[in-house]
Design a protein with these regions (language model features):
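Electrostatic, structured charged patches in enzyme active sites and in nucleic-acid/phosphate-binding
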Residues: 1-257
Length: 257
């Protein structure tokens, strides 16, 4: 017999007037846990910042999670951290919403809805294009729904943003550069070796070219991987919009050793 899934009842808590929220401990993914039917979750990225897997539902969400692991201003990220119930719009009483991600930035927490640009702004359809008309109308409804969500979070004094693949590539990092960092983020170092890198950066005024940093780890098979692995740890940062090379400038991050 198939194993029966454990059902978890939502325990709503007050968020603000007209808005309730349901959360689990440690920001565990609420939607997947509650229903047990999120069968379109396609994978999980092992986040070095979180030291565990962060679930994603498709390419654009995976892109967001990977970028979150690389940008300095993102400290931690959780998938589907809460569900809110809105009773502030009479025609949409009891509307339910679950944000895709909660990110702890240096400046505070932000909830994110991750969407493809064409889901929000599809091309204007021709008169004969019935499928295009359907997508056009669906996008209008989606934008209206997200405006209601933004208003609910605004009333609760919480930050909410919608981000697309365009925004990720423009403000967070070039996808190819992010992928290179993620592909080389598993190199561990001894504390004294790490201290050598941090000390060299401090003594150089906070920045060194990549080749100088690599020279500190000549004894390992891939010195650049050791350096890039320090990015998710927020020990260093680089320009995520330029290809990584010997002359890439490595800056000290926000974590001291």
């Amino acid at each position: 017999m198939p194993r029966r899934r454990r059902k978890i009842e939502r325990a709503w808590g007050f968020l603000c007037e007209g808005v309730d929220a349901f959360r689990l401990e440690a920001n565990e993914a609420v939607r997947r846990v509650i229903t047990g039917r999120r069968n379109h979750i396609v994978g999980g990225h092992f986040s070095m910042k979180m030291r565990g897997h962060v679930v994603h539902e498709g390419g654009i969400e995976e892109r967001f999670v990977r970028a979150s692991d690389c940008v300095l201003h993102a400290k931690r990220v959780w998938a589907q951290p809460e569900t809110i119930r809105m009773n502030i719009f009479p025609e949409f009483e009891g509307e339910i919403y679950t944000p895709d991600y909660l990110v702890e930035h240096d400046a505070g927490f932000i909830r994110y809805e991750v969407k493809q640009w064409t889901e929000l702004r599809p091309p204007k359809p021709a008169d004969w294009d019935e499928d295009g008309k359907r997508k056009w109308e669906e996008a209008k409804l989606l934008r209206a729904r997200l405006r209601r969500v933004r208003e609910a979070y605004r009333r609760a004094s919480l930050s909410f943003r919608v981000i697309t693949e365009r925004g990720i590539a423009k403000y967070w990092g070039d996808p190819d550069v992010v992928d290179e960092v993620i592909a080389n983020d598993r190199w561990d170092v001894e504390p004294e070796e790490l201290n050598r890198l941090v000390t060299a950066l401090v003594e150089a005024g906070g920045s060194l070219p990549m080749w100088r940093c690599e020279a500190l780890f000549e004894q390992v098979p891939f010195p650049r991987g050791v350096v890039l692995s320090r990015i998710p740890e927020r020990i260093i940062r680089i320009d995520l919009f330029s290809p990584v090379g010997p002359h890439t400038i490595v800056h000290i991050g926000v974590v001291s050793c």
